[in-house]
Regions:
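N-terminal cationic and glycine-rich segments that engage phosphates or anionic surfaces
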Residues: 1-101, 105-252
Length: 252
C-alpha cells in the first residue's frame, strides 16, 4: 500500500489531483466552522442538549457537525443526494428523461444540470423551513424577514457550494467528489464520537472495567470492518446456460 502511494506521488498528474482534493477538503472543513449570520448560538446548544435522537445524530454526522454548529454548511450535500435519488426515480417514471439518459454524454449532462436546479430548490425549501419553523422558537437572534432571508440564502449558497466542490473534485481531483465530501464529514465526527464513548464507558471506571469496555468496543469495530469487507468482496457465481443453435450437423 505504501509503495502504491509512493508511486502515485511520483506521477505529477496524480500528485496534482491529490493536492487539489486535499485543498478542497480543507476549504470544506474551514467553512464548517463559520457560523451562519443571525443565528442564536445558545438556542442551538439547548436544542441539541434536549434532542439527542438517532435521526438528529445521523443527520449531524452526514454534515460533519455543521448542523449542530449551524454553520454555513449546515445542510451539507443532503439536498444534492435527495435530488439525485429523485432524478433516478423520475428517469424510470418519465419517458422523456429516460430517453435523455440514453442520449449518451449530452443526455447525462442535461440530467446533471436538472439535478443541480432541483438541489437548489430543495435547499431553499429546507432552509426556509428551518428559518421559519425554528426561527419562531428562538433560532434567529431577531425573528424578522431580513434575518430569515439571510439565513435562507446563506444555507442555500453553502449547500450549492458543496455541490460545486464535489463536482470539481470529480473532475479535477481523485475519486467521486460527492462521496468524498460525505466521507470526510463522517470521519470528522470520529474524534468526538470516541470522546463520547470514553466518557460513557471508560471514564470513572475501574481499570478492569475500562479495559473490558475498550476491548468490547474494539471488537465491535473490527467485526463491523470485517463484515463490510466481506459484503463488499462477496460474490455468488451463477451458472449461465446458452441456448443451442443447430447449423447443419453441428451444434453451437
Amino acid at each position: 500500500m505504501f509503495k502504491t502511494l509512493q508511486r502515485a506521488f511520483q506521477i505529477k498528474d496524480i500528485r496534482k489531483k491529490i493536492f487539489y482534493t486535499f485543498m478542497m477538503l480543507v476549504v470544506i472543513r474551514l467553512g464548517s466552522q463559520l457560523p451562519t449570520p443571525g443565528i442564536n448560538a445558545s438556542y442551538i446548544q439547548d436544542f441539541f442538549a434536549q434532542n439527542t435522537g438517532e435521526a438528529f445524530n445521523l443527520f449531524n454526522a452526514f454534515t460533519g457537525g455543521s448542523f449542530e454548529q449551524m454553520s454555513i454548511f449546515a445542510l451539507s450535500i443532503t439536498p444534492y443526494i435527495t435530488s439525485s435519488i429523485i432524478m433516478q426515480l423520475l428517469t424510470i417514471a418519465i419517458p422523456k428523461l429516460e430517453e435523455m439518459q440514453k442520449e449518451g454524454e449530452d443526455g447525462r449532462k442535461k440530467i446533471a444540470s436538472i439535478t443541480r436546479y432541483v438541489t437548489v430548490i430543495l435547499a431553499l425549501i429546507e432552509s426556509t423551513a428551518m428559518a421559519v419553523g425554528f426561527g419562531r422558537q428562538g433560532l434567529l437572534e431577531e425573528y424578522n424577514f431580513v434575518n430569515a432571508a439571510i439565513v435562507v440564502l446563506t444555507l442555500t449558497a453553502g449547500s450549492a457550494f458543496l455541490m460545486w466542490v464535489g463536482e470539481r473534485i470529480t473532475e479535477k481531483g481523485v475519486g467521486n467528489g460527492i462521496s468524498i465530501v460525505l466521507v470526510i464529514n463522517i470521519i470528522s465526527r470520529v474524534p468526538s464520537d470516541m470522546t463520547t464513548l470514553y466518557e460513557q464507558f471508560v471514564k470513572g471506571k475501574s481499570i478492569a472495567s475500562a479495559a473490558l469496555a475498550v476491548l468490547i468496543i474494539l471488537a465491535i469495530i473490527l467485526a463491523l470492518v470485517v463484515l463490510v469487507v466481506i459484503l463488499q468482496g462477496g460474490e455468488r457465481r451463477i451458472a449461465v446456460q446458452y441456448s443451442q443453435k443447430m447449423q447443419g450437423r453441428r451444434t453451437y
